[in-house]
């Protein structure tokens, strides 16, 4: 599992990383977590991620623009918007983000969201393999 965390405020990158690692450890899941404090770096990385936690208000690329770019690489990516702002909620929903979480992070909401995201990813993988098997006539 590959996870990206991007926020232009490094304290939120670190806080999110710690909380997500703790949740994953409770679920016995290993993940590679890449940290970004620049929207340019993640926008241009070209990497495939299963889950991304994105701040919304960043320069030069907003979290919405970064999410669009990440979805171009993996249309099944699970996007969490982590922000202090309510006014971008409609834009985020238009992009079908998975969760919109306000700062400071509510650990209970984050844990619930991450666990649901993991279930969704598992279901997508199972569906994909069943589709492959049925195409091969197995």
Regions found by a protein language model. Give the residues of each.
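Acidic catalytic/metal-coordinating carboxylates
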Residues: 62-66
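Conserved binding/recognition cores within well-folded domains
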Residues: 112-138
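A short, hydrophobic beta-strand element within the central beta-sheet of small alpha/beta folds
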Residues: 76-86
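Acidic, metal-coordinating helix/loop segments flanking the phosphotransfer/catalytic sites
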Residues: 35-51
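A Lys-centered signature of the CheY-like receiver
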Residues: 103
